[in-house]
């Protein structure tokens, strides 16, 4: 661990020098890249330096204790030792956590896709409830939501909806929502009062930037068509909706607002994100073969959570967490679940670091 910390500190010092170089300062891309890297390393370096200082103070105090002959002086040094000693394991634990490789996607915006799955109309209604839940959570975080694609269901909710959440750290908090969500409740149309079980799937994709993926124009098939609303009614009179297909992968994205130019931009952004995500999924699958994560496999068919309305209970199956606050959670109060999943992921990564897997 300490060898790694020395390397981190050396790199931090090197970045300080680079950021003072006039050639770097005049290069916007390099300046942004190095500034971000330095910011990412700063806390680790500060904690490591604090650790070295405390350790040195403790060693000096122990040495003074051996030389002190006066009882009052010994008592004073003993107090200092008792103050310094517990700080060592605390700082070591912090350093271990800071050495855990940060997910490079954590600071990104998020593209979320929710689909009604098993359960017919109830599944679509539940998909709408999940969209509302994430919208409320995003509002509380001060994030902005922009709807990309929708396919509204006839009896409420969505057959599918894709939207982007714009805000720093959105992916770090919402990445754990990836998977199948199950709901148990009595539908409003159910006269016999029987509990029905339905599911909706949630896909969480980090928004991709142009520099991260290159898509050739010749690999795209772009089509325009007339957008239709629920029940087949035409909502615009021109062929403004856009469908873009990435020919090598077969991945498709659509957008159906009134402006064809905006639709093309939105559909292309969504397509790039989906193509990038497909590559990311491949890489993550390789890692999960080496080690199963404490917060699930990340597979979108994996059942991750159950929402039991009659018992006001939400259970996250990946970490065995049960909370009797469903009424609050569906209103966007996701903090308790997200915090527990974050801790589980950190613990898992720390174990992997100790085992030499990371």
UniProtKB/Swiss-Prot annotation:
Q: Which residues form a coiled coil?
A: none
Molecular function terms from GO: translation release factor activity, codon specific
Q: Which GO terms describe its cellular component?
A: cytoplasm
- Sequence positions bearing N5-methylglutamine: 233
Pfam families to which the protein is assigned, alphabetical: PCRF, RF-1
Keywords associated with the record: Cytoplasm, Methylation, Protein biosynthesis
Task: Kindly give the PROSITE patterns that the UniProt entry links to this protein.
Answer: RF_PROK_I
Transmembrane parts of this sequence: none
Cell location: Cytoplasm
Q: Per its UniProt record, what InterPro entries does this chain match?
A: PCRF, Pep_chain_release_fac_I, Pep_chain_release_fac_I_sf, Prokaryotic/Mito_RF, RF-1
Q: How is it modified after translation?
A: Methylated by PrmC. Methylation increases the termination efficiency of RF1.
PANTHER family attached to this UniProt entry: LD18447P
What family name appears in the similarity comment? Belongs to the prokaryotic/mitochondrial release factor family.
Q: What does this protein do?
A: Peptide chain release factor 1 directs the termination of translation in response to the peptide chain termination codons UAG and UAA.
Q: What is this protein called?
A: Peptide chain release factor 1
Upper taxonomic lineage: Bacteria, Bacillati, Bacillota, Bacilli, Bacillales
State the encoding gene: prfA
